């Protein structure tokens, strides 16, 4: 390169620098004096090339990012709808697989029947697909575009658009609507249960002074005391009971217990039943209606059915016996010594009291028959005698005092004093549940769960042998009974005979629960569990019927027989044989009038 060429290049560079950076003239002349070394020139060239490369890459990535904006992002409504569809389909179990199969088959069939599907722009495939996942996909199509399903018959030939157009097909079948409705109904049940259990959480968090209730876009703030009121709790419990029965009725009527039976029904029958329903109610064909017409028709359908009272709430609540008891609870006329709401898995205290009132009356009806009274007395004798035999004791003395108790209850002269004795202990209703199940059995189990520290120290002492521990436990039980005898106001009353029975039974049960893990412990635990299971069963709508006193008494009798047979079977043939040989005389019946006392 000649000197002239170098000078020209330097001149042009200086001129460019002056024009770009608007340098002063003085700077321009000073630049002419600057000379760059070869290393500086190389660094300048590398920097310039790098800057150009960075600018080019930034522009390239910016274009790619602009193209990706057209794709569905994870947080956009379309993607969320598909994710919700997958979750709903996975929860359906076997119906999920059938829904996917229907989607796959429909994808292949739409190519062959492209012209046919376009006959109904807004619902041409109304009965072609089933499953909750497809019905959720139809919601997207209704909200976005009604003509995207079959807007152009030639679009079905494009492989890239098949999946998208398939999801947008409005698949509004009766089965899908039923499944979606049941999902929303179950969600409502969960919300109501949370509202009912809010009262228990209120005690744990007393700092909360208000609660927000969401209703659409409006949010109302009300105090906890106004919402969690007694009247509100009663109404919510009654609503939940009606909702449970309504759910069971729908499942029994429409085959809700087997989701596959709904999802796999033939499309022809579904179409026919839907058209017949529309024709009977005088509504236009749903196949040729848009979303607005469908909404209006659904409103008319609901109004007509409500007017006809075909699906009224009362028709799904065949429990007038329970409803009457609930009204008495709201008026404060039902009393219970102990509220066992959580133990018996009731919805609330009102639910427990209402069921308790029904159970009391049912037991009155059961004990009105002599056969039932004899059965209960004989069953109690066998079970307790077998427990004593398992503890290697002679049940003869126990059976004698047991017979004395039965003879005492048969004498009408002692009924008034017995009622006073029990009322002083909080038992105001002379009933099989209140006296036997609650006061005697459940209180005994609770006392054995929390024994005195003196008994615990003896039982947990490793240096003492089992026989000494058993004797110490028996002595502790007898000392407690002796103290209770001293507090009795009537020396020969109900509690005198009851404590006489406890002298033989309490040491056996105490050693059975607190002693070593042997056959006696297993039998005592089984006896306790059967009592608890029986109580839970009679307080469960799924196990007994609260429609009337007769049906409830019938179910209680069946449960009594079932639990007693299980206990007798578990006792073993040897224990029963020994107990039978020691039995003196025939069994005595429980007095009728005492156990048939009216519930106040």
UniProtKB/Swiss-Prot annotation:
The record gives the membrane topology as: Multi-pass membrane protein
Effect of knocking it out? Mitochondrial fragmentation: mitochondria become round and show loss of cristae. Female mice show decreased quality of oocytes. Mice lacking both Miga1 and Miga2 show strongly reduced quality of oocytes and are subfertile.
Question: Where does the record place the modification Phosphoserine?
Answer: 257, 261
A single Gene Ontology MF term assigned here is: protein heterodimerization activity
Say where the protein is mainly found: mitochondrion
Matching InterPro entries, A to Z? Answer: Miga (IPR019392)
Can you supply one Gene Ontology CC term for this chain's record? mitochondrial outer membrane
- Keyword Iron listed? The answer is no
Task: Name its GO BP terms in alphabetical order.
Answer: mitochondrial fusion
Q: Where in the cell is it found?
A: Mitochondrion outer membrane
Q: Is-annotated flag, keyword Transmembrane helix?
A: yes
The alphabetical list of record keywords is:
Membrane, Mitochondrion, Mitochondrion outer membrane, Phosphoprotein, Transmembrane, Transmembrane helix
Which residue ranges traverse the bilayer? 15-32, 38-58
Could you tell me what this protein does?
Regulator of mitochondrial fusion. Acts by forming homo- and heterodimers at the mitochondrial outer membrane and facilitating the formation of PLD6/MitoPLD dimers. May act by regulating phospholipid metabolism via PLD6/MitoPLD.
Task: Identify its protein family.
Answer: Belongs to the mitoguardin family.
What is annotated about its quaternary structure and interactions?
Homodimer and heterodimer; forms heterodimers with MIGA2. Interacts with PLD6/MitoPLD.
> What is the name attached to this protein's record?
Mitoguardin 1
């Amino acid at each position: 390169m000649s000197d002239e060429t170098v000078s020209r290049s330097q001149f042009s560079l200086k001129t460019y620098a002056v024009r770009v950076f608007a340098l002063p003239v003085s700077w321009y002349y000073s630049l002419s004096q600057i000379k760059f070394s070869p290393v500086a020139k190389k660094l300048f060239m590398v920097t310039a090339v790098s800057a150009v490369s960075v600018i080019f890459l930034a522009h390239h990535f910016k274009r790619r990012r602009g193209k990706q904006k057209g794709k569905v992002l994870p947080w956009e409504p379309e993607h969320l709808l598909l994710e919700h569809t997958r979750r709903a389909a996975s929860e359906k179990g076997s119906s999920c697989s059938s829904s996917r199969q229907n989607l796959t088959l429909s994808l292949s069939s739409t190519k062959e029947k492209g012209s046919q599907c376009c006959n109904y722009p807004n619902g041409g495939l109304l009965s072609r697909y089933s499953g909750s996942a497809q019905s959720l996909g139809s919601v997207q199509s209704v909200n976005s575009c009604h003509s995207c399903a079959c807007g152009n018959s030639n679009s079905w030939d494009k492989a890239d658009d098949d999946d998208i157009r398939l999801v947008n097909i409005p698949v509004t079948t009766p089965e899908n609507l039923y499944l979606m409705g049941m999902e929303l109904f179950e969600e409502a049940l969960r919300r109501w249960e949370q509202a009912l259990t809010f009262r228990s959480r209120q005690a744990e968090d007393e700092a909360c002074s208000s609660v927000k209730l969401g209703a659409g876009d409006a949010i109302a703030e009300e105090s906890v005391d106004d919402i969690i009121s007694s009247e509100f709790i009663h109404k919510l419990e009654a609503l939940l009971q009606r909702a449970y029965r309504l759910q069971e009725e729908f499942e029994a009527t429409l085959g809700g217990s087997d989701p596959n039976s709904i999802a796999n029904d033939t499309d022809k029958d579904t179409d026919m039943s839907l058209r017949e329903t529309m024709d009977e109610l005088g509504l236009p064909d749903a196949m040729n209606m848009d979303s607005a017409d469908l909404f209006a028709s659904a409103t008319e359908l609901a109004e007509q059915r409500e007017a006809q009272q075909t699906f009224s709430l009362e028709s799904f609540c065949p429990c007038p016996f329970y409803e009457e008891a609930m009204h008495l609870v709201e008026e404060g006329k039902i009393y219970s010594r102990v509220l066992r709401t959580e133990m018996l898995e009731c919805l609330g205290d009102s639910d427990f009291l209402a069921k308790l009132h029904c159970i009391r009356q049912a037991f009155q009806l059961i004990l009105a028959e002599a056969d039932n009274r004899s059965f209960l007395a004989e069953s109690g004798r066998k079970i307790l005698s077998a427990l004593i035999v398992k503890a290697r004791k002679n049940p003869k003395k126990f059976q004698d005092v047991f017979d004395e108790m039965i003879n005492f209850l048969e004498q009408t002269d002692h009924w008034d004093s017995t009622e006073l004795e029990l009322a002083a202990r909080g038992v105001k209703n002379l009933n099989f549940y209140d006296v036997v199940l609650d006061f005697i059995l459940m209180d005994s189990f609770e006392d054995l769960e929390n024994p005195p520290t003196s008994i615990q120290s003896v039982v947990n002492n490793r240096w003492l042998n089992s026989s000494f521990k058993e004797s110490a436990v028996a002595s502790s039980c007898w000392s407690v009974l002796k103290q209770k005898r001293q507090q009795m106001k009537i020396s020969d009353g109900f509690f005198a005979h009851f404590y006489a029975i406890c002298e033989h039974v309490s040491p056996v049960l105490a050693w059975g629960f607190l002693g070593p893990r042997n056959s006696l412990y297993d039998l005592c635990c089984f006896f306790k569990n059967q009592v608890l299971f029986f109580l839970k069963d009679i307080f469960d709508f799924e196990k007994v019927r609260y429609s009337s006193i007769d049906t409830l008494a019938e179910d209680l009798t069946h449960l009594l027989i079932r639990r007693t047979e299980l206990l007798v079977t578990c006792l073993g043939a040897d224990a029963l044989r020994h107990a039978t040989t020691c039995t003196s005389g025939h069994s005595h019946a429980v007095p009728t009038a005492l156990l048939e006392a009216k519930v106040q």
